[in-house]
């Protein structure tokens, strides 16, 4: 037991200017005093921001040598949910020991967690009473000899008798720990020679002798001692009671020390990013104690600068800025800058080499072929990309004139007069021009959709001039990675190679207008998703423009300018080619075998419509497929999202993921995937005409978790980020497949900022995502936990309920998100649900993500619960409620039974806002057994009568089948909630 040094008396007096937590602008504050593992709290003072505690507010505690600080926390009492955090203050024991008389002070409240809203102060009265009793003399001569560093006495004792190395001193510290902390190398060596020396034992703080040795030792010749301690049982990554490893303790050495011991620990297998119970890494410790050389060494050896740790949680850079150490701030910032730069270039594998050799952005322009040789960078593609990027930093304009801007459009200029000299166009200011976005450093994208009409001499034939229109889209071979969402909105405009004269006016892309004094121009294009007719009359002195909207079926854009020259633009396809997609990281594609000729696709049924495109049921090579078509193929953000989804679906070949057949990139951007005939899990749960039994529950539930596990175990790891029952599809043979990877990301360094953004359907979003923390596998587990709750409720209650629908005051998704993240509100599991199932759901939905199970643990636990069900089927089945419409019915011939046909279901919901269409209901009978797994009805209707030919553009499809209507369904909760399909009307 730790030695007592005194006692402290703390009186919580009052607070002022506290943060309002209730809707009425008030709070119900109370205080909690924490000393070690002991807590005592005051009563709550109702409806005030200036509380005064006058009773039950005085507490006394004993203080021992191990206590570092006393904490006082303030909370807002809440009758119906968890209490809200209002702030805390930490008072060091060293400061408290100075308060030998009653001392009253105001203490400013700090946030308990980074995003907490905190204000105000709390007034405390503190007095410290020192313990005047002297420690008793050591009873053991062995302990006394160690503390006196008497090696001769110890050697005599070892020769005379067998010594007990586990004997402790008066404070409970074992003999071997006292020796390890003595900084006496001969003494420690002598003890370790004892064959019975047990060095794996722990002291009262959970430290091994290795913990104490690396903290107290000042000798550089200590490798033999470390080796012997490890050989005798000290684990290199063993944790003490605070979660500290030997590497953490080495950072706390009280004397100025080189990194020798730290180097030795890493060589022995110490985990450089190991986190304590407060999530601190060794890098955090080195920053806290201000050891610049340690920080430098950790950074050079792979320390993660994005890990948050401490209380409140901070990244290493945030911590360094808070402590105000300019040297450490500079080193951490340099590492972040070079890492971001290499990530944008998709060269993250080179980050360790650059950091190890301290090649940061301040010297990046000095890189040449010789530097790359010294760094042992031999891959030609990496060398080319690096040298190109370095040239762009030196001169951002140097590459713009050589850029090859792709386009599939031709501009045909028809001149009614005898114009054989294109220079007349320039004299009349008729040159078409648009800005080209720079792909310079830090800009993830170029602007797409703009094009420039360039008159070309020597192409005149029968008064026709053909000139090429060049589109502008980033090629990932030559510019930075677009995986980071934060890059999408960065735009750096530069002058094009042939800038417009100052007197000219350049219209905005994607519909450039030729401005001239005596010209008539007609432009036809399929670039824009919305079709318009533009009539423009312009002279050098006066320009007027009128715009009217044409019917959606008319896919042309006409621009009329008075009077004599006509320009026709042929429909422009996507500004993408094979190289744009083949160059993406992590994809498993050979050459261009994945490219699908859109002419081989047949569009049969419109399954759903979202903000960025549509999903069709169709055929490819005689096989039913789902075709996801991008609505706009010139919007740079849409194209970037298309690339991201393509990158995920083309890379994954897991059995629990919808199969990727290929993609079309010529006439339209589309992804062709496996068609799942039974639709989504959401629609299966929503179908209230069919029973959802425990067998269904366990069969689909285990498959769903297993499918998620296949994503998390992929290399590199995939995070779905939008997991919900609507994105779990079910095939004809009841196999669960995960779909909709529009928000999914690889868990790599290039996606760190993206993974910290709020994404997904709010009812399924984990609390940490709301607070801006990085999205992890445990965030996906939370979403799967909500899905498991959804299935549990449907199985027990017999009806489907959306998550949080039992709370009538939560009408909008943002209310759900705030309540779940800040109030710890969770969907209510049925009271009669089996206890094991309730516990599993609760574990997956716990606020602390580190306490949630992994997908493997989740899967294994559900299998155990399934075994429990199989052993107690009657008991489990007895708690289920079966509505009358789900009871077995006799076969009724020729009866039309409304149901959710598989073709009615959105096979790949590409957006939260989804328009669902359905097919004509078919004749079928109600099976005597309503079990879903025994329902063998053929859901694949013969759609031969409904086939339609491929549209010229995706937006011309308003009725994929003449007998089918698109029905937009709305809900009062939010547009991000799942849509409900309805039967088709003729």
UniProtKB/Swiss-Prot annotation:
Q: Where does ATP bind?
A: 607-615, 628
Q: List where Low complexity composition bias occurs.
A: 412-438, 454-464, 493-520, 546-571, 901-913, 928-947
Binding positions for Ca(2+) 1 per the UniProt entry: 22, 28, 76, 78
DNA damage as a keyword?
A: no
CDD domains under this entry? C2, STKc_MAP3K-like
Q: Which UniProt keywords apply?
A: ANK repeat, ATP-binding, Calcium, Kinase, Metal-binding, Nucleotide-binding, Repeat, Serine/threonine-protein kinase, Transferase
Textual note on the cofactor: Binds 3 Ca(2+) ions per C2 domain.
Q: Where does Ca(2+) 2 bind?
A: 22, 76, 78, 84
Any one Gene Ontology BP term? signal transduction
- ANK repeat coordinates: 137-167, 171-201, 205-238, 242-274, 278-307, 312-344
Domain SAM span(s) in chain numbering: 333-396
Region: Disordered; residue ranges are: 412-520, 532-574, 901-986
Enumerate the active-site residues: 722
Q: Which reaction is catalysed here? A: L-seryl-[protein] + ATP = O-phospho-L-seryl-[protein] + ADP + H(+); L-threonyl-[protein] + ATP = O-phospho-L-threonyl-[protein] + ADP + H(+)
Show where the Protein kinase domain sits: 601-870
Spell out the SUPFAM superfamilies in the cross-references: Ankyrin repeat (SSF48403), C2 domain (Calcium/lipid-binding domain, CaLB) (SSF49562), Protein kinase-like (PK-like) (SSF56112), SAM/Pointed domain (SSF47769)
**Polar residues composition bias: residue spans:** 439-448, 465-476, 948-959, 969-978
Family, as annotated? Belongs to the protein kinase superfamily. TKL Ser/Thr protein kinase family.
Q: What is this protein called?
A: Probable serine/threonine-protein kinase DDB_G0272092
Q: Which organism is it from?
A: Dictyostelium discoideum (Social amoeba)
């Amino acid at each position: 037991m730790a030695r007592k040094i005194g006692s402290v008396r703390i009186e919580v007096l009052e607070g002022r200017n506290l943060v309002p937590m209730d809707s009425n602008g008030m709070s119900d504050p109370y205080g909690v005093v924490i000393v070690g593992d002991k807590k005592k709290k005051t009563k709550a003072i109702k409806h005030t921001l200036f509380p005064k505690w006058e009773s039950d507010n005085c507490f006394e505690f004993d203080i021992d040598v191990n206590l570092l600080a006393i904490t006082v926390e303030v909370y807002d009492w809440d009758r119906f949910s968890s209490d809200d955090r209002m702030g805390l203050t930490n008072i060091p024991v060293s400061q408290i020991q100075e308060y030998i008389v009653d001392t009253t002070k105001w203490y400013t409240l700090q946030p308990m967690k980074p995003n907490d809203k905190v204000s105000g102060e709390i007034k405390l009265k503190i007095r410290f009473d020192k313990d005047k009793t002297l420690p008793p003399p050591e009873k053991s001569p062995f302990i006394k000899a160690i503390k006196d560093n008497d090696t001769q006495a110890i050697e005599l004792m070892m020769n005379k008798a067998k010594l007990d190395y586990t004997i402790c001193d008066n404070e409970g510290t074992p003999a071997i720990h006292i020796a390890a902390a003595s900084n006496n190398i001969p003494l420690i060596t002598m003890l370790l020679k004892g064959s019975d020396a047990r060095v794996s034992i722990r002291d009262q703080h959970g430290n091994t002798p290795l913990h104490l040795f690396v903290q107290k030792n000042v000798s550089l010749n200590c490798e033999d001692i470390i080796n012997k301690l490890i050989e005798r049982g000290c684990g290199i990554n063993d944790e003490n009671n605070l979660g500290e490893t030997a590497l953490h303790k080495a950072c706390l050495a009280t004397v100025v020390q080189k990194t020798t011991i730290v180097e030795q620990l890493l060589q022995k297998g110490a985990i450089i990013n190991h986190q304590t119970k407060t999530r601190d890494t060794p890098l955090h410790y080195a920053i806290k104690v201000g050891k610049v050389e340690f920080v430098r060494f950790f950074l050079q050896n792979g320390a993660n600068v994005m890990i948050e740790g401490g209380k409140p949680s901070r990244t290493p850079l945030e911590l360094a800025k808070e402590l105000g150490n300019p040297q450490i701030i500079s080193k951490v910032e340099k590492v972040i800058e070079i890492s971001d730069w290499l990530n944008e270039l998709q060269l993250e594998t080179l980050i360790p080499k650059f950091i190890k050799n301290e090649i940061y952005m301040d010297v990046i322009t000095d890189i040449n072929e010789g530097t790359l040789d010294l760094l042992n960078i031999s891959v030609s593609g990496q060398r080319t990309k690096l040298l190109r990027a370095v040239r762009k930093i030196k001169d951002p304009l140097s590459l713009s004139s050589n850029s090859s801007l792709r386009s599939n459009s031709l501009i045909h200029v028809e001149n009614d007069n005898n114009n054989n000299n294109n220079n007349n166009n320039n004299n009349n200011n008729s040159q078409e021009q648009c800005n080209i976005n720079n792909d310079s450093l830090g800009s993830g994208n170029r602007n797409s959709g703009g094009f420039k009409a360039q008159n070309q001499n020597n192409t005149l034939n029968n008064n026709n001039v053909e000139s090429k229109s060049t589109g502008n889209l980033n090629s990932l071979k030559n510019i930075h990675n677009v995986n980071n969402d934060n890059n999408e909105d960065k735009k750096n405009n530069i002058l094009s190679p042939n800038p417009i004269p100052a007197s000219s006016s350049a219209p905005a892309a994607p519909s450039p207008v030729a401005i001239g004094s005596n010209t008539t121009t007609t432009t036809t294009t399929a670039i824009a998703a919305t079709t318009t007719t533009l009539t423009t009359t312009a002279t050098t002195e006066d320009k007027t423009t009128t715009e009217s909207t044409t019917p959606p079926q008319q896919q042309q854009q006409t621009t009329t300018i008075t009077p004599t020259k006509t320009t026709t633009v042929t429909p422009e396809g996507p500004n993408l080619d094979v190289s744009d997609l083949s160059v993406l990281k992590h994809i498993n594609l050979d050459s261009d075998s994945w490219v699908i000729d859109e002419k081989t696709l047949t569009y049969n049924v419109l399954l759903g419509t979202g903000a960025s495109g549509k999903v069709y049921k169709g055929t490819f090579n005689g096989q039913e497929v789902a075709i996801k078509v991008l609505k706009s193929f010139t919007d740079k953000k849409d194209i970037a999202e298309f690339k991201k989804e393509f990158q995920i679906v083309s890379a994954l070949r897991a059995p629990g993921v919808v199969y990727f057949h290929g993609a079309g990139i010529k006439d339209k951007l589309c992804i062709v995937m496996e068609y799942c005939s039974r639709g989504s899990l959401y629609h299966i749960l929503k179908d209230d005409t069919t029973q959802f039994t425990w067998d269904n529950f366990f069969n689909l539930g285990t498959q769903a978790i297993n499918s998620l596990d296949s994503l998390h175990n992929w290399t590199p790891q995939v995070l779905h980020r939008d997991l919900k029952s609507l994105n779990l599809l079910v095939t004809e043979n009841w196999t669960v497949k995960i779909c909709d990877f529009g928000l999914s990301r690889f868990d790599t360094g290039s996606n760190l900022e993206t993974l910290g953004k709020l994404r997904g359907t709010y009812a399924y979003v984990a609390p940490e995502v709301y607070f801006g923390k990085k999205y992890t596998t445990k965030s996906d587990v939370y979403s799967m936990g909500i899905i498991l709750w959804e299935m549990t409720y449907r199985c027990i209650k017999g009806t489907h309920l959306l998550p949080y629908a039992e709370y009538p005051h939560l009408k909008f998704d943002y209310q759900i998100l705030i309540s779940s993240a800040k109030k710890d509100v969770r969907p209510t599991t049925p009271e009669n649900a089996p206890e094991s199932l309730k516990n599993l759901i609760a574990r997956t939905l716990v606020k602390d993500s580190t306490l949630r199970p992994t997908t493997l643990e989740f899967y294994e636990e559900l299998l155990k619960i399934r075994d429990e069900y199989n052993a107690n089927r009657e008991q489990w089945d007895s708690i289920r409620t079966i509505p009358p419409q789900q009871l077995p019915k006799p076969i009724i011939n020729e009866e039309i039974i409304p149901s959710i046909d598989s073709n009615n279901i959105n096979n790949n919901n590409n957006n939260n806002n989804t328009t669902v269409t359905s097919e004509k209901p078919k004749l079928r009978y109600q099976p005597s057994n309503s079990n879903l797994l025994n329902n063998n009805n053929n859901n694949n209707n013969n759609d031969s009568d409904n086939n339609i030919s491929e549209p010229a553009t995706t937006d011309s499809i308003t009725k994929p089948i003449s007998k089918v209507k698109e029905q937009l369904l709305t809900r009062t909760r939010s547009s991000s909630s799942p849509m409900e399909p309805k039967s088709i009307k003729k």
